[in-house]
Amino acid sequence: MLFRSDITVAFRVELPELFTITSAEYEAIHSAWAKAVKVLPNFCVVHKQDWFIRENYTPEIQKDDLSFLSRSFERHFNERPYLNHTCYLLLTKTTKERSRRQSDFSTLCRGFIVPKEIQDKETALKFLESTSQFERIVGDSGFIKLTRLTGDEITGTPTQAGIIEKYFALSQYYTTSLQDISLAAADMRIGDNLLCLHTLSDAEDLPSQVRTDGRYEKLSTDRSDCRLSFASPLGVLLSCNHIYNQYIFIDDHTENLQRFEKQARNMHSLSRYSRGNQINKEWIEKYLNEAHSYGLTSVRCHCNVMAWSDDAEELKRIKNDVGSQLALMECKPRHNTVDTPTLYWAGIPGNEGDFPAEESFYTFIEQALCFFTEETSYQSSPSPFGIKMVDRLTGKPLHLDISDLPMKRGIITNRNKFILGPSGSGKSFFTNHMVRQYYEQGTHVLIVDTGNSYQGLCEMINRMTGGKDGVYFTYTEENPIAFNPFYTDDGVFDIEKRESIKTLILTLWKRDNEPPTRAEEVAL
């Protein structure tokens, strides 16, 4: 995609499901991103754009073969709100000139917008080669899947909206309509929606340390950790309509360090006039020492959360929620009211080159990547066989295959299930739910019930099938369980039947450590 003098390659990103990644796996994902970013040429922009849209669950009650319980399940979750996550990755090749521009410059003011660097075929080919390497490195990690978007998926067709049109409409629907954009002194409005923007654009607003992942206290215990990425509070844990933009600007690393060396010398010369100059000089030297000691690459970074609502009162609550989530990351919440139009304009897919340089801060690739969200919401299994479960965060129903699909992917080697929990935690309730759906999909189910937990389910199935299925054998003193091993429907005793009777008699007659003699076997 060629947009505003820049070349952009767009991907749809499939991230791992939340609460399914360990700390070591988060490190592996972070390492894969870092390796991929390093293959990109200078003056590239890595823009990861995560959409989180509130939607309501639509029940599947139109199917004719639904049982009473399945239909009741669907009706119970009708209109259940949940957060739908869509992730895009945009790799943009810009120029040195555009990467340094401030917010007071826009390509809208230029007559000819394609610079000489982009017109060079060799530059374009090298960039496209590096994006292919980027895609391969990230895909080889085994945790993230990148799917390159086509031209129609970016710009849209007469019948379906592309990602650019969706961005202008603040929607992820394929059939959407463009909205009027209104800019006022105090706010920005798109259609009926009011926007609010929180930014991470200054190193002073950042925590003293960043990390790849952290402990999610609500689902962790003293003996086990539930891990989420460092930036997860701005992702699936923020339950409102919002876009989380993450930018990494790759400049000329050598030139950056030379500029910092010059600044350090200037600060040293002015240190006797101000203690602040001396402190700045020490910070710059620490940055340079880190870069030289560990071979780190100097980049610029920016993150922002763009949230919206059509209700002014709800928007106030959203502002507080975003600020609270930033505080959970130990970041200083900064509600930006001045640069909302500029940053919204720079967030258009393909327009990353128009990002205002003063809204970014210098860091290294590894630290910048810690601000990437690395998980998505739970997804339904593609397998036709499975059971209905619900998302533990929002309660949205999901179709999950916990037997065949994990076996096919090599996650498990058998289909055994071990259900563990204290008394009253719902073990029998879940098993009733599981075996009932397995039965409805044609599975033969045999249960040894020691507490009559499944008698009600069997009686219901027995009534539905007219006694064909749902047969329940139980023991009472008046009517103990008994069977005649010598009975056959046709009165014919084949070899298999005779062997089973022989085995039964030996089991009842002999002990485990008392093998039968040859004469006894012949007699039988």
Place the predicted regions along the sequence by residue.
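Hydrophobic alpha-helical scaffolding
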Residues: 117-120, 124, 274-277, 308, ...
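Conserved structured core elements
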Residues: 23, 27, 128, 299, ...
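Switch/coupling segment of Walker-type NTPase motor domains
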Residues: 49-51, 56-60, 75-80, 433-524
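Extended, folded cores of ATP/NTP-driven motor/assembly subunits in large transport
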Residues: 1-375
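Glycine- and acidic
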Residues: 13-21, 116, 300-308, 412-420, ...
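An acidic- and aromatic-residue-enriched active-site/binding cleft used to recognize and process polar
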Residues: 16, 49-52, 92-94, 310, ...
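Glycine-rich phosphate-binding loop of nucleotide-binding enzymes
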Residues: 23, 31-38, 385-474
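Beta-sheet entry/capping signal
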Residues: 8-10, 43-47, 86-88, 302-304, ...
